[in-house]
Amino acid sequence: IQKGRLIGVVPKRNLPNYSEFYEARNFCPGNERPVMTCWNGEKVPMGTNLLFRCNTMPELTVAAEICEDVWVPCPPSIRHALAGATVVVNCSASDETTGKDMYRHDLICSQSARLVCGYVYANAGEGESTQDLVFGGQNIIAENGTCLVESRRFINESICADMDLERLDSERRRMSTFPDPAAAREEGGYLTVEFSFDAVSEDSARSQDTQAHGSTQPGGDVLRYVDPAPFVPRDERQRNRRCEEILSIQAMGLKKRLEHTGCHEAVIGLSGGLDSTLALLVTVRAFDSLRIPRSGIHCITMPCFGTTDRTYNNACTLAGKVGAKLREINIREAVTRHFEDIGHDMDKHDVTYENSQARERTQVLMDIANEVGGLVIGTGDMSELALGWAT
């Protein structure tokens, strides 16, 4: 229903007839391929394979399934997502039993992750409860595996949240295994109903009672919290787990490379900064897992024009603490000679000035690695790589 007008009817496809459910006694499954039915003097499409596409918001295509549909091995929402639906809505009457809410929560979130979609789950509440069944009104809005907002049960609470439809669209385009929706639409006999969607004003967004689940942020009508540090969890335990996981992944990758090449020596340019420090810790972990003596780790500190006592002392302390070999090679004279060779002004601190030092350090590391028969450990980070630049 949109603006007081019925634009499509989606029937239930899977009817439960077990435990407390006996729907198949009185009902039959709805048809998949849409047919036209008459409603209030107008022809309206009816069928499970209906898509509602917003012509004013290209990334918004809505499909629907009913209650039990999402609990079956092959839910209709799978076909809907493959046909192009970015948001799936589920009108449900799922009764309460002990522990069912947690299963229901995981089910909705996992379905949104599998389909790379938004999933809006609206469940029956107190007004639908009878002497046979109790409905808790557990409403959930999930996006690509993340629960954006969930209502508290048994208090008839409404919820709302923002979905990043452009991100969902981008994720699907990135996945080569997510098929072209046109073929799925044709195969499933899908009918697309066009509708328009007026943008919600800031005032109306703020006026909605979100019960502190999606309060608006200052300066805009965005209801969801946008984490300024998305890769760094705020919860300390989760953050520690994430850091441990990152170190383990990197160490395992380096371990495999050391095993494959038969190298028992590693060379690191240790500046005392963050990136080279983490690279050293990863290397130490990889060596320990292979039971290779840490003395096979060669830390090279190469002071030049911008080196401070603090970073130099950090490098020396780190190498000593982990039991690695430390070697100092001052590259100031070599870089100065290079500037003279190319006629570069020493007082001109431009890209050439900075990169010449980095290139000289790399040459030193490569040569030492050749001498000891080892591998140079890269100290570049993902931010550099994203910008097309590497240490």
List each language-model region with its residue ranges.
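Nucleotide-activated chemistry modules centered on ATP-dependent adenylation/adenylyltransferase
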Residues: V89, D95, V116, T336-K348, ...
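Hydrophobic alpha-helical scaffolding
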Residues: I66-V70, S94-D101, V232-E244, T301-T308, ...
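Short, ordered loop/turn segments at secondary-structure junctions
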Residues: A93-S94, A124, S271, M302-F305, ...
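Enzyme catalytic cores with a strong preference for nitrogen-chemistry domains
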Residues: I1-G269, R285-R294
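Generic, well-ordered alpha-helical scaffold segments in large soluble proteins
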Residues: Q111, I249, G253-T261, G273, ...
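A glycine-rich phosphate-binding loop feature that marks nucleotide/adenosyl-phosphate handling sites
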Residues: C263-S276, R332-V335, D381-L385
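ATP-dependent adenylation/pyrophosphate-handling site
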Residues: V89, H264-L270, L274-C316
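A conserved beta-strand->alpha-helix junction
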Residues: C160, Q208-D227, I292, G296-T352, ...
